[in-house]
Amino acid sequence: MNSVLGNQTDVAGLFLANSSEALERAVRCCTQASVVTDDGFAEGGPDERSLYIMRVVQIAVMCVLSLTVVFGIFFLGCNLLIKSEGMINFLVKDRRPSKEVEAVVVGPY
């Protein structure tokens, strides 16, 4: 029971003290550099290999998202182009050439 009370007062003293040593202990206490594995060796932050793998995965995800956006814009543009051609053809079918134009075209040949 006294050890628990002692630990609480140590922590309170750590944060209430104005000395640089107390601040240093508080910072060391809560960083990844102070994590100790079962073997007794301190484990640092993520190693180079895991950072490389994370970077490759990020690049792959960004490439897939970029391709999705590019193809989405492309197919949307194609769809709009097809619809506009259909509307133009609809308007062209409504126009009828006059019979005089046909007579002139057929005449000289």
Swiss-Prot record:
Modified residues (Phosphoserine): S98
List of glycosylated residues: N7, N18
Lineage top rank: taxon: Eukaryota
Transmembrane feature ranges: 56-76
Record's subcellular location: Cytoplasm; Membrane
GO biological process, one term: regulation of cell cycle
Keywords: Cytoplasm, Glycoprotein, Membrane, Phosphoprotein, Transmembrane, Transmembrane helix
InterPro entries registered for this protein in UniProt: Reprimo_fam (IPR043383)
Membrane topology, as annotated: Single-pass membrane protein
One GO cellular component term: cytoplasm
Function description: May be involved in the regulation of p53-dependent G2 arrest of the cell cycle. Seems to induce cell cycle arrest by inhibiting CDK1 activity and nuclear translocation of the CDC2 cyclin B1 complex.
Family, as annotated: Belongs to the reprimo family.
Protein name according to UniProt: Protein reprimo
Gene behind this protein: Rprm
